């Protein structure tokens, strides 16, 4: 089954598939400078919390690899600036900060072990590759846990794009769907278009179609109608940040889907890696919500579709934990009360990762 490759580390640099051009064009760019990677994250060449984390790790490694520093101390100072630049790109996706913190820890370990810049550079590149490899294993585990909750047959709704394009593996929400479909479950996916950036229409529909999984594309204002038919058996989405109490930030429009699911007795699930947990914040009120350009609302692929008026564009909303039936992770399934179940999973052992490519 086809699996998209949004990002790869190569000898020539970090290669990213430009997701802004999908589905009409499949164009990739090769980046050799961490500033270019930061710009690619900010401008959504790559998007999706786990994939942003992979990109940040690779950006940090690129910065170290191509640093002109002549000493470890000079490299330390430069690495601080590298992480600062990458950290300013997307404020809501906690995987970004998780990845940078991990790369910082590895950098400190390498500097403590060796004064050879070549050793440090090599170690950072290997760590970035390992982050990507772990994301692939994580997606598979999430998919296997979550698939058990999918119906034997019927409609499953998702939101935005939480597939391979968003993670670098098989996807979180779409990973659950993919594994369930491969198990022989006769599911049909309802894909809201996800205005204003159309990640559902452009990316999720593209991934599912390429993978041979049956789907129907719907507009965002059709969600309630389809819920009310009684044919939707489950909803599964990804997440960009999960607070300690289970409140979850995901792409704008997710909250209203969760409310409609509750009203229509449809279980609403979240599929996300442990790295998306932010147990340092008590609830969703503390999750920063990224405000993107109003032009992404008033224009569609460069064409103005609205008059020259004020437009709001919060990129995410927060779904309260009370609407979430379960959260699928690579270490198992969390259920309410999330304040205890999330911490238990976060403290658990990480599944083993194969070193095979």
Protein language model regions, located:
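Conserved phosphate/anionic-ligand binding catalytic regions in large, soluble enzymes, centered on
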Residues: 43-56, 90, 96, 158-169, ...
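Structural signal for hydrophobic packing residues in well-ordered secondary-structure cores
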Residues: 45, 64, 68, 83-90, ...
